């Protein structure tokens, strides 16, 4: 079977997360085999993450988190039965997954937060709180992405290993607070964004001040040994880093191919990241491409969170890429779920790459298909769409909403569901190539128009 570049790849079976989750490994391989028998192009990513050099670390972390999840489930069960409802309702809640559950959700979640931090990072461990307070925010991915390069500190503040970055925010520092969005101070834009979403001004100011205070604490917080072990070796962290590597590899290969085939300068090409967050992954791609070729495309970074975009601007300046990015702070979806019209962002321009690899797992099927069609409209003939989703048959899948307590809810999908949604959006099966990360956590879909 060939990929878009005409290269043969072996239709091998996977040893996902080194096979430590036997049930997930079996289900993923069965799913992949079925899809291949139907003529779908599905490949398995390589184990290139540094964590794979420490297989015992991956196995030990998996077992450590499995024990923690079991303990948290028991704590949750006891709390529900003692505090929240009649026996009949309690039995229903007890069987409900770790997600928001109406009026009970906040009460349960608030209670569990105290135990999550201890079970994740050690009985007396509180130094991870600044990171955990960012859950649901794109800033958490700065820590995960740069896990191997973070300095690690002991209980008494001594350096156990010196890394490229001194704190858990990785490359992000306090210069982010000085950034402006469309010429306006960051704080002002953040407050206005909340007001636009129906929050009164006084509450908006209070919430923004609290968030900025939490981010400042995050930027200053050191990384402890237990915290470092988890973010280096857990399945979710591996999956995120592998997703980035896969997306960036596809992007660089495509841009180089277009430059050679169509005799175009990479400098003149256009890439869009829809729901870009801090833009770290895309900026890494730009930096690598510029280092290799001396050229880089213009990248449109589109997100609705002003703070994440301020982080993207700050990082772009550090890497001398500010002239290669366009920042657009826009609400990505209407209240009814309709995707933002890209006409206002792109005008008459066409994209060489449309990427939204960290977004689809938060979207209902209908919105997923609408976003696909909207992006395709602005993609050049021969352009590349890159998207993805967390796998429903992934290893240790209960961890994300359980012990981790991640919000909002992630819609894990089978690989087959990903193919079907893309096909229902008007994309032929032959135009889709899927890469399942070596951890088994994510599938990245590449679609050539």
Can you describe what each PLM-predicted range is?
Residues 4-111, 136-144, 212, 233-246, ...:
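Class I (Rossmann-like) S-adenosyl-L-methionine-dependent methyltransferase catalytic domain
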Residues 125-183, 196, 210-263:
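Class I SAM-dependent methyltransferase Rossmann-like catalytic core
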Residues 265-277:
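Conserved class I S-adenosyl-L-methionine
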Residues 336-348:
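Short amphipathic alpha-helix with an adjacent loop that forms part of the alpha/beta core around
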Residues 352:
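Conserved acidic residues
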Residues 355:
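A conserved beta-strand element that flanks and buttresses the S-adenosyl-L-methionine
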Residues 361-363:
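A short His-aromatic
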Residues 369-381:
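A short glycine-rich, Lys/Arg-flanked "PGG" loop and its adjoining helix->strand segment in the class I
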């Amino acid at each position: 079977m060939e990929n878009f570049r005409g290269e043969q790849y072996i239709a091998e079976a996977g040893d996902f997360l080194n096979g430590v989750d036997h049930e997930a490994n079996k289900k993923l391989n069965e799913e992949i085999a079925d899809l291949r028998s139907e003529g779908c192009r599905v490949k398995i990513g390589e184990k290139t993450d540094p964590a794979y050099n420490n297989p015992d670390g991956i196995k030990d972390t998996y077992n450590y988190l499995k024990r923690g999840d079991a303990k948290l489930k028991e704590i949750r069960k006891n709390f529900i039965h003692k505090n929240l409802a009649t026996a009949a309702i309690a039995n229903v809640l007890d069987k409900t997954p770790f997600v928001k559950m109406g009026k009970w959700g906040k009460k349960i979640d608030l209670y569990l937060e105290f135990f999550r931090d201890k079970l994740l990072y050690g009985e007396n461990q509180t130094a991870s709180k600044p990171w955990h307070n960012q859950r649901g925010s794109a800033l958490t991915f700065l820590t995960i992405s740069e896990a191997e390069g973070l300095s690690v500190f002991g209980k008494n503040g001594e350096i156990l290993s010196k890394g490229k970055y001194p704190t858990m925010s990785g490359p992000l520092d306090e210069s982010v607070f000085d950034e402006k969005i469309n010429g306006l101070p960051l704080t002002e834009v953040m407050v206005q964004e909340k007001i636009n979403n129906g929050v009164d001004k006084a509450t908006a100011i209070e919430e923004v001040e609290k968030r900025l205070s939490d981010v400042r604490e995050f930027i200053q917080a050191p990384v402890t040994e237990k915290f470092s072990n988890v973010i280096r070796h857990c399945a979710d962290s591996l999956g995120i880093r592998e997703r980035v590597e896969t997306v960036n590899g596809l992007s660089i290969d495509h841009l180089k191919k277009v430059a050679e085939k169509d005799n175009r300068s990479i400098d003149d090409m256009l890439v869009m990241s829809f729901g870009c967050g801090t833009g770290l992954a895309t900026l890494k791609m730009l930096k690598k491409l510029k280092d290799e070729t001396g050229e880089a495309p213009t990248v449109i970074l589109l997100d609705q969170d002003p703070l994440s975009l301020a982080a993207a601007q700050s990082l772009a300046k550090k890497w001398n890429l500010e002239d290669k990015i366009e920042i657009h702070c826009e609400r990505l979806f209407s209240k009814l779920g309709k995707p933002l019209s890209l006409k206002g962002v792109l005008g008459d321009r066409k994209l060489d790459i449309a990427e939204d690899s960290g977004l689809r797992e938060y979207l209902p099927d209908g919105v997923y298909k609408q976003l696909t069609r909207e992006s395709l409209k602005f993609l050049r003939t021969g352009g590349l769409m890159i998207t993805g989703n967390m796998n429903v048959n992934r290893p240790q899948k209960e961890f994300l909403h359980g012990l981790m307590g991640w919000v909002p809810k992630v819609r894990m999908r089978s690989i087959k569901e990903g193919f079907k949604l893309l096909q229902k959006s008007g994309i032929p099966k032959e135009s889709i190539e899927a890469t399942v990360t070596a951890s088994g956590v994510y599938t990245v879909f590449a679609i050539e128009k």
